[in-house]
Amino acid sequence: MKITVHSSKAVKPVYGDAVAAPSTADVVPLSVFDRANFDTYVSVIYAFRPPAPANSVLEAGLAKALAEYREWAGRLGVDGDGDRAILLNDAGARFVEATADVTLDSVVPLEPTPRVTSLHPSADDDGAEAEVMMVQVTRFACGSLAVGFTAHHMVSDGRATSNFFLAWSQATRGVAIHPVPVHDRASFFTPRDPPRVDYEHRGVEFKTCEKLDRNENNDDGHGHGHDGEVVVTHKVHFSREFISKLKALASAGGGQRSYSTLQCVVAHLWRCITMARGLEGSVATSVSIAVDGRARMSPPVLDGYTGNVVLWARPTATARELVTMPLQHAMGLINRAVARINDGYFKSFVDFANSGAVEEERLVASADAAEMVLSPNIEVDSWLRIPFYELDFGSGQPFLFTPSYLPVEGLLILLPSFSGDGSVDAYVPLFSHDMDTFKNCCYVLPELS
């Protein structure tokens, strides 16, 4: 597959004749949740069957959407105090037009390999001000269209980014944007008076600078570990029937608690990955699960909020405990850890992050985008509730959605299957020497104990 780039331009917001252009000197400080998130870019790819709107139509829709979501047309820089902030300078979002010399059917399914990185823009943040979002539209020989996004994670989480994608498609179709974007990053997360730090956040969301040394637990950025081990990604498809059987196992033996699809699938994957890695029994392993605070906080954060509202649950067990105990045990660990990240926990985090301790103790975010090998732990990004398949530029919904190639050993991404029947696709990156064992385990239901 050869991709030819024909143009690259900055698309700026178009406000219309009835709306006065706002100031381009405004600065939006990052919230405590933004600053605790990964300082990196995330790329995703949508694919649409023909007929697809012309590039000029997509560009015009993008300009209209950017007028409602100005942060995406801005830059990530610093404010007058030297703190990271979004600069609302209307510099524009990069819009790349490209063509492919093959039909889309000849390369689908798009496997999570380096080849897919040619379908979205690469970030260039070497300067003082970093681009926030980039888009690439690629036309295939058959008329199909791939739309690749690259967006900075410190600006928004998956839910907020998806809302912008929907806004772009709505603006392209000429319909009202919904949900209405909510840009206020200050008033939602004000600390309490007096503050109440009821939970420990050191060593959880924050770590000391001394712990930044990644020495041997790292990767060269190209899917190779410190001693040349190769990271490969396997896409696991869990059918609705398989997931139903996992849930049935949870209630076997008189268990009364019900578990979500996410909890069942993650528990199964956590056990399988631990077995595939061959960890010593006494080794502690944890799974980091992103928890959306929108509905958990009281009052709830509005669905149209444009920033990050995510913290992480981190259930932990020894490898021996995890693989010798029944699946219900892992599910219970996950269930209790996720339930713990409630309104009180989110507010405790806000109070701690604003207490001055982070600055006084020189703490930094534990979310480390440079950490490329997570073993003995895993991290899970669940996109199961994000409406990717509602994106419609006027010619129908996408028939394919995929994350880009991201060779971080142990970083799992869960997606709803495009079939819409309740099945789940999991992208699982592991060292190549662990993958055969993982494949032999992940499609087999655990035995009752």
Curated annotation (Swiss-Prot):
InterPro entries xref list: CAT-like_dom_sf, Plant_Fungal_Acyltransferase
Pfam families, alphabetized: Transferase
Tissues where this protein is expressed: Highly expressed in roots. Expressed at low levels in flowers.
Top-rank taxon, per record: Eukaryota
Active site positions: H153, D392
Keywords: Acyltransferase, Transferase
Disulfide partners: none
Entry keyword annotation includes Transmembrane helix: no
Alphabetized GO MF terms: acyltransferase activity, transferring groups other than amino-acyl groups; hydroxycinnamoyltransferase activity
Entry annotated with the keyword Transferase: yes
EC category name: transferase
Coiled-coil segments on the chain, per record: none
E.C. designation(s): 2.3.1.-
Protein purpose: Hydroxycinnamoyl transferase that catalyzes the transfer of an acyl from p-coumaryol-CoA to agmatine, to produce coumaroyl agmatine. Can use feruloyl-CoA, caffeoyl-CoA and sinapoyl-CoA as acyl donors. Seems to be able to transfer the acyl group from p-coumaroyl-CoA and feruloyl-CoA to the acyl acceptors putrescine and spermidine.
Family: Belongs to the plant acyltransferase family.
The name this protein goes by in its record: Agmatine hydroxycinnamoyltransferase 1
Organism: Oryza sativa subsp. japonica (Rice)
